[in-house]
């Protein structure tokens, strides 16, 4: 059965993360939540409709997309893995890959 209106969280609203957030927000029925270290970036994403809300509850997500540098991605997932619900799909879209 296809799940409609999935809750998608995107951590890192730089060029790649914000582009994906905008595409998901405008072309799907997903509810997109976003998080970035820069508060102004989050506020701009909210104002432009790129995200529906700031990401504050990882446990509500169906999908978590991490758009950070590789080491920051590993650290973020290690620090927050227990907050994710069972069955949440976690993926990264790091622009640079190396063994971590």
Regions found by a protein language model. Give the residues of each.
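Beta-loop-alpha module in the N-terminal Rossmann-like domain of NAD(P)-dependent dehydrogenases
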Residues: 67-79, 99
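Conserved acidic residues
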Residues: 52, 62, 88
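Rossmann-fold NAD(P)-binding glycine/threonine-rich loop
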Residues: 94-100
